Amino acid sequence: MALNLRKNHRILKIINDALIDLPTPSNISTWWNFGSLLGVCLITQIITGLLLAMHYTADTNLAFSSVAHICRDVQFGWLIRNLHANGASFFFICIYLHIGRGLYYGSYLYKETWNIGVILLLALMATAFVGYVLPWGQMSFWGATVITNLFSAIPYIGQTLVEWAWGGFSVDNPTLTRFFALHFLLPFVIVGLTLVHLTFLHETGSNNPLGIPSDCDKIPFHPYYTIKDILGFVLMLSLLVSLALFSPNLLGDPENFTPANPLVTPPHIKPEWYFLFAYAILRSIPNKLGGVLALAASILVLFLTPLLHTSKLRSMTFRPLSQILFWTLVANVLILTWVGSQPVEHPFIIIGQLASFTYFTIILVLFPLAALLENKLLKL
């Protein structure tokens, strides 16, 4: 009998074990689609980004014009640019939903997978930040100035670090060229980390909505979940293309249509919508170093979630108190996102401070306490 190439070929076997014959819990819901959607986002961003990089010029005198040239003169350049810019938004929507799923269903108990996931989030945020600087509009320039300046809050080495990052004494040509280099490099780092993320996930297998072992009831990934994933791809790509074609600038800042001018500061400096929650936390602390630490903590706190899990149950499916807290946290992050887009004045300052305090309190204090209380109530 002829050998099955799919199961015996050294390379095809790896693909087979990851995407075809992978034993998968039979009850995972649509919340488990976001991992594959993130993969599609990554591939889309790399392809569109590569096409844009072929026509872009990383020079302060030419960057803005080169982006205009892409949109006006390159075949379908406007579409490629709009897909790339809005693709970033979809990437963040998917990753936030993916993290939310992980928090709700206790997937963070796969510690290695979770920790690499958090590193992936940090890499994605870094990539998006350096990418936003490249069109060299007003918000690109001032966003880069404000965010890189935060490193100067680090005691002793801060100022040296900032000037080293800038390649001079202000955000200028060296900054733009190195940001372009980093923006080109980081997606491939993300690809590598994604493979490690998947390797660790396939060591344990997927979690499921009940949070109980599912070894007794596994089904092959193909055809069941390949079909389910393709439905997700179609829906997401339809939404992305619709956004890119009908209102490509909906999520952007009008300020970025003005070329960068170091002599004119925009009235409201704010990042893209997907960073607003962290920006609100940064702004809510009146001290520079304190704000930077809070900003870092807002993401790094995710590393602590596996250590703060006190419940005897893995998932929140059967934990109503934790569910209430979880949805309060979601609402809280949305409030932070809104506050981050508002000017620094009353009442937004106090709302931001309360929301920032609540964010950390829910994650660090209330989640573990609620879980302990539920253990008692359920006599576990």
Curated annotation (Swiss-Prot):
Single GO term (MF): ubiquinol-cytochrome-c reductase activity
Cofactor(s) the protein needs: heme b
Top-level division of the source organism's lineage: Eukaryota
Membrane topology: Multi-pass membrane protein
Main localization (coarse): mitochondrion
Binding-site residues for heme b b566, renumbered to this chain: H98, H197
Binding site for heme b b562: H84, H183
PROSITE patterns (UniProt xref): CYTB_CTER, CYTB_NTER
Transmembrane segment boundaries: 34-54, 78-99, 114-134, 179-199, 227-247, 289-309, 321-341, 348-368
Extra remark: Heme 1 (or BL or b562) is low-potential and absorbs at about 562 nm, and heme 2 (or BH or b566) is high-potential and absorbs at about 566 nm.
Known function: Component of the ubiquinol-cytochrome c reductase complex (complex III or cytochrome b-c1 complex) that is part of the mitochondrial respiratory chain. The b-c1 complex mediates electron transfer from ubiquinol to cytochrome c. Contributes to the generation of a proton gradient across the mitochondrial membrane that is then used for ATP synthesis.
Name recorded for this polypeptide: Cytochrome b
Organism: Icteria virens
